[in-house]
């Protein structure tokens, strides 16, 4: 894809906007045809057109990447708060009892049983689920115990009109299928 900078966005911001931290999971996926939750949710027409369009001939201005990068930054910041930050002190400030804080484990192995009473918190974990001849994959935002959270940065219109609620619920349901 060709990139322009028609808005003359300053170099530090432009470089940040052009970062793509997406990892499909293909390198660690089990054998089979891989299909992501987000791809599965796209309209059929969009999926067909994406395969027909030569992306090397398409052009995008770096200014069009702001909302996408802001959403990605929100996810990164939340993840870092739990993996690199002092989440224990933050929970104490929020008046959580120390007995609860002591039970929390961040990203414990999903394939091993947890000790009784442990509260697992999983952040940005990718999962795979075989379904017939495909491998469905998705990366959840935040799972605390068995309660799933998905962080969205969306337009005011989408929020107030609730126009994307069904899509958000479907995404959550598919993640629940992958991460039972």
Give, region by region, the residue ranges found by the protein language model:
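Metal-dependent nuclease catalytic cores that hydrolyze phosphodiester bonds in DNA/RNA
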Residues: 1-147, 159-161
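Broad hydrophobic/π-residue packing in well-ordered secondary structure
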Residues: 47-49, 151, 168, 175
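Metal-dependent nuclease catalytic cores in nucleic-acid-processing enzymes
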Residues: 76-82, 161-180
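Acidic active-site catalytic centers that drive phospho-/nucleotidyl reactions
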Residues: 141, 150, 171
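Secondary-structure boundary elements
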Residues: 144-148, 177-180
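Short beta-strand-loop-alpha-helix junction that forms the active-site gateway
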Residues: 151-163
